[in-house]
Every structure is written in C-alpha cells, then in structure tokens.
Amino acid sequence: MLIEIGRKIQQARKIRRITQADLGNALGISRNTIGQLERGTVQDIGVRKLIRVLEFLGLELQTRPAGRPPTLEELRDEEIR
C-alpha cells in the first residue's frame, strides 16, 4: 500500500514539475523523507504529514475493505486521474 501511495505522490509531483526538495521545503519535510515516501520506504511520517503532502499535490486518500479488488468504477476513476 505504501509503495502505491508513494508512486501516486511521485506522479503528481512530477506532473506539477515540483522537485522533492521544493515539495519538502513547502511543507517543512526533508527531501530525504519525501524520497522515502515516494519509494514506500518511509519509516514513520505520520498521518497528518501524509495528508498535507497529498493535499498539496491535489490528491486524497481513499480506503476500501482489505482483500477486495477494486470495482470497475474505481479503476475508471484511477485512469482519469
């Protein structure tokens, strides 16, 4: 799950042409932590910081029951983003 979230963060950041350093500076988070977050290897970023990163990039966190595959609608929404 963290790898998927990180991949989405990296995609959104690159689309907006923001460097890891610029994103980190804007949010008070180190470039190293942003890199770890994008790779899915961050140890403990905290939910509040994660949400700040997501909101800054125009993303939101969604949940679904564990083990349930995504619906066609969810997959379609994913492609649109």
Task: Show the residue positions of the predicted features.
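Short, charged recognition helix plus adjacent turn
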Residues: 62-81
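Short, solvent-exposed alpha-helical "recognition" segments
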Residues: 41-46
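Short alpha-helical DNA-recognition segment
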Residues: 19-35
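Short basic helix-loop element that most often maps to the first helix and adjoining turn
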Residues: 8-22
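DNA major-groove recognition helix of helix-turn-helix/homeodomain DNA-binding modules
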Residues: 47-62
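A detector for short, charged/polar N-terminal pre-domain segments
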Residues: 1-4
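Short polybasic/polar patches that bind polyanions
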Residues: 14, 25, 55
